Amino acid sequence: MNTKTLIVVFLVCLLVSEVVLARRCGGGRKIKIKKIVRKLRPIVRVMKVITRMRTRRPRPRPCNSS
């Protein structure tokens, strides 16, 4: 699997677990979800920077051993 997809899957799992915990504990569920989204924003920014770096620099062609 791609590293980017693994990160996304991991973040989704974290979100789901936090939402389940918020439901069990009751109370301000929306507030907890907002806090989770705030925590994830820097990670999303880092992923965007990585994708920009990859698209800007073309990958060198593999060397032919023939």
UniProtKB/Swiss-Prot annotation:
Residues 1-22 form the signal peptide. Its main location: secreted. The keyword Cytoplasm does not apply. GO terms for cellular component: extracellular region. Contains 1 disulfide bond. Coiled coil: none annotated. Keywords: Disulfide bond, Secreted, Signal. The keyword Lipid metabolism does not apply. Expressed by the venom gland. It is found in: Secreted. This is Venom protein 27.1. It comes from Lychas mucronatus.
